[in-house]
Amino acid sequence: MSNQYQEEGCSERPECKSKSPTLLSSYCIDSILGRRSPCKMRLLGAAQSLPAPLASRADQEKAMQGSPKSSSAPFEAELHLPPKLRRLYGPGGGRLLQGAAAAAAAAAAAAAAATATGTAGPRGEVPPPPPPAARPGERQDSAGAVAAAAAAAAWDTLKISQAPQVSISRSKSYRENGAPFVPPPPALDELSGPGGVAHPEERLSAASGPGSAPAAGGGTGAEDDEEELLEDEEDEEEEEELLEDDDEELLEDDARALLKEPRRCSVATTGTVAAAAAAAAAAVATEGGELSPKEELLLHPEDAEGKDGEDSVCLSAGSDSEEGLLKRKQRRYRTTFTSYQLEELERAFQKTHYPDVFTREELAMRLDLTEARVQVWFQNRRAKWRKREKAGAQTHPPGLPFPGPLSATHPLSPYLDASPFPPHHPALDSAWTAAAAAAAAAFPSLPPPPGSASLPPSGAPLGLSTFLGAAVFRHPAFISPAFGRLFSTMAPLTSASTAAALLRQPTPAVEGAVASGALADPATAAADRRASSIAALRLKAKEHAAQLTQLNILPGTSTGKEVC
């Protein structure tokens, strides 16, 4: 594991990235040919021994194969593999026919020898000049770097064939970046050539045979290869766990992508970590005899990708549908109220249109309902009441008075004497009449009219201040806990004291009317008295504001105000 992490760390360090792609490509070639990586060779102090194995391998394979350049062309034309399979099915992987592997190795060795002597590359390219001087941190000498650069040019055709697919989900794109698409096994059988192994089992046995260890090792011992394979498998298991975490925790995808970005870049650039992990999974499978699910995912990721992509899409689409089904199942049916419940609720609505939470809870306990249902009933009841109000305002033209208990003979009766209550609200009507009578009694100089409303005598001149004093101060904006301070600041209005007396006096005058209404509980009598008087004032003020707006006396913005 330590060597594996040293390789990745070296490929991720900025000085390694800033050198050039030649070192990275040499890293690819050395790993594909089965030798130790340049980082390990530098750590072991054997950086100067690179050209000797290259030359020895070149001589051996020239003796075996003849002309190396003639064999490199068909190999390049045949082998279009992603980086993950280059070690499985590439040269030295033991998965192709031994002749094909030797031909591939001969092609790479010939490229290295040609660049070492200064000739052109495999595709007729002029190799780049070697680096000037090797620093102590260099992974190999200049001749090795130039050889690797020219040999990497032979693999450019492989890189062209790896266009990224269009990903459906982010988790699928992560898996595609980490483990590229693997062609199905029949296509791999065709790649092995006319004399290739026919079945995957035979190919596995050929890979685990005694002759595959030197081919995969490429000059190193079989024990070193076993250690490398075990380390690679552990590293790949960690990557698989990270991928599973990505699939399970989609909310953390962005953060995980940022954390994995340099690591994924190094894997995509070198192409050896994934390839070594795939080879490790194959080797463990040949030793153990059967594949674990994670290793099957490594060898056949196209099946897993198809399933994973479909599952992720179905889950993302199905989660919404499942939530929708749950919501549909949990849909609340309409509450059916009994006649007793409706009677009690209507009685409470007569007392106040806006009951507080304590009143609602008490009603809910008495009527065997929930507080939420009581609140919704009051909302609906208020909406119905507003609708009736609008319908009543449209049926009466603005100049004619509303039908009410008070006399309509006075000119201001449409504004002060109108009663918004339907006939089944006697308690509130009587409360408002009693309040008006009490306010009139507070001013003996102003004799009350026959309807006992607080109005100046008909012979007195009706100024605008008198009208506004009666109407504006009964608007909902002025019915607030601070109305006493407000009245004290508005002395120029002649009827301000009249309105203040009207708002101060109703509680003692209303006691008889409210007590006569069907209230059996004496504990809530005071609260109900206050609620009924405030409700009466609110309703009267709302209707006065509507009337004044129709006559363009007050601005239109004050029509829809309600005090909650």
Curated annotation (Swiss-Prot):
The keyword Nucleus applies. One of its GO terms (cellular component) is nucleus. GO terms for molecular function: chromatin binding; DNA-binding transcription activator activity, RNA polymerase II-specific; DNA-binding transcription factor activity, RNA polymerase II-specific; DNA-binding transcription repressor activity, RNA polymerase II-specific; RNA polymerase II cis-regulatory region sequence-specific DNA binding. Residues 111-124, 143-154, 205-215 have a biased composition (Low complexity). A motif (OAR) lies at residues 532-545. Residues 1-21, 54-79, 111-264 are annotated as: Disordered. Pfam families: Homeodomain, OAR. Residues 222-252 have a biased composition (Acidic residues). Residues 159-171 have a biased composition (Polar residues). Keywords: Developmental protein, Differentiation, DNA-binding, Homeobox, Neurogenesis, Nucleus, Transcription, Transcription regulation. Residues 253-264 have a biased composition (Basic and acidic residues). Residues 330-389 bind DNA. SMART domains: HOX (SM00389). GO terms for biological process: axon guidance; cell proliferation in forebrain; cerebral cortex GABAergic interneuron migration; cerebral cortex tangential migration; embryonic olfactory bulb interneuron precursor migration; epithelial cell fate commitment; forebrain development; globus pallidus development. It is found in: Nucleus. Residues 125-134 have a biased composition (Pro residues). CDD domains: homeodomain. Disruption phenotype: Hemizygous knockout males were born at 19.5 dpc and died within a half day. Neonatal males have small brains, small olfactory bulbs, small testes, hypoplasia of the seminal vesicle and abnormally enlarged seminiferous tubules. Abnormal morphology in each of the developing brain regions in which ARX is normally expressed. Suppressed proliferation and nearly normal migration of neuroepithelial cells in the neocortex. Aberrant formation of many nerve fiber tracts at 19.5 dpc. Abnormal primary migration of GABAergic interneurons from the ganglionic eminence. Belongs to the paired homeobox family. Bicoid subfamily. Transcription factor. Binds to specific sequence motif 5'-TAATTA-3' in regulatory elements of target genes, such as histone demethylase KDM5C. Positively modulates transcription of KDM5C. Activates expression of KDM5C synergistically with histone lysine demethylase PHF8 and perhaps in competition with transcription regulator ZNF711; synergy may be related to enrichment of histone H3K4me3 in regulatory elements. Required for normal brain development. Plays a role in neuronal proliferation, interneuronal migration and differentiation in the embryonic forebrain. This is Homeobox protein ARX. It comes from Mus musculus (Mouse).
